[in-house]
A protein has these predicted regions:
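Membrane-interface starts of transmembrane alpha-helices
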Residues: 5, 25-28, 75, 177, ...
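Membrane-proximal helix-loop-helix units in multi-pass membrane proteins
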Residues: 74-134
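Long, highly hydrophobic alpha-helical transmembrane signal-anchor segments
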Residues: 42-86, 157-171
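Glycine/small-residue-rich interface belts in oligomeric ring/scaffold proteins
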Residues: 23-54
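Alpha-helical transmembrane segments and their cytosolic membrane-interface
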Residues: 1-35
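Lipid-exposed faces of alpha-helical membrane segments in multi-pass integral membrane proteins
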Residues: 5-8, 12, 34-38, 58-59, ...
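Structural signature of transmembrane alpha-helix termini at the membrane-water interface
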Residues: 15-22, 41-45, 66, 89-96, ...
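C-terminal membrane-adjacent module
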Residues: 115-228
Length: 228
């Protein structure tokens, strides 16, 4: 239930952030920040963690202060960078010695193996390499997000510190990539990789929808523990 609520808040944030950039509207930017804060603190608040009750009003005050100063849209430039880097880290950290790569854990969850040794060596190598590939793709996306945030005009990161953008793009163009097309790249990579994997390891899935059903069948507890 919490994951669903966070997803809805995330979708609301994406919509408001894009509209705020398109229309240069500080009120919508403030609304996007409020939804972002809610998405981050909702779980710890419901778990009654003391730090969340301290952080929430502080974050709300910072958002309002930025709005009052006319800079509510500035943090929105960095959110896609931080978000994508954080996801890349979820993949990359599992590549350390002694850890089970994230994609390997997902495949083990689907196939019911007790550990990496339960997978065929070829499949085990593939899942490790795929984990590294996801981390690499996401880091490249984060770099693109940061570059576009720097050169956006008006009020991009460079212009916010008094440096003229060498190759200006509009805020709407930045937002189109950072808040919308990012997800298209992720979805495209996901679909293309599945098509390749289905040929590389035939007989494991009846089709793409069957694969999605198996992912959903892992349940919220599996996904919560996977991302911790």
């Amino acid at each position: 239930m919490i994951l669903l609520l966070q997803l809805l808040l995330g979708l609301g944030y994406t919509a408001l952030a894009h509209l705020a950039s398109r229309w240069h509207h500080d009120g919508l930017a403030l609304g996007a920040l409020v939804l972002l804060i809610a998405m981050v603190v909702i779980e710890p608040l419901l778990a009654r963690r003391p730090w969340a009750f301290i952080a929430t009003p502080l974050l709300a005050w910072v958002a309002w202060a930025l709005y009052a100063a006319g800079h509510a849209a500035l943090p929105l430039l960095l959110v896609p960078v931080v978000f994508v880097v954080a996801i890349a880290w979820l993949f990359a950290r599992t590549l350390r010695a002694g850890s089970v790569p994230l994609i390997t854990r997902i495949v083990l969850g689907i196939e019911g193996g007790d550990g990496p040794g339960a997978l065929e060596p070829d499949l085990r190598r593939y899942t490790r390499n795929l984990t590294a590939a996801w981390a690499g793709v996401l880091l490249l996306m984060a770099g693109a997000n940061l570059l576009l945030a720097l050169i956006a005009s008006p009020a991009g990161l460079l212009e916010s510190v008094g440096v003229a953008s060498p190759l200006p793009i509009t805020q709407e163009q930045w937002s189109l990539w950072a808040n919308l097309l990012n997800y298209g790249v992720i979805g495209g990579f996901f679909v293309v990789e599945f098509a390749f994997r289905k040929r590389r390891f035939p007989g494991r899935y009846a089709g793409f929808l069957d694969f999605l059903r198996k992912l959903a069948g892992l349940g919220p507890v599996f996904w919560r523990d996977l991302l911790r």
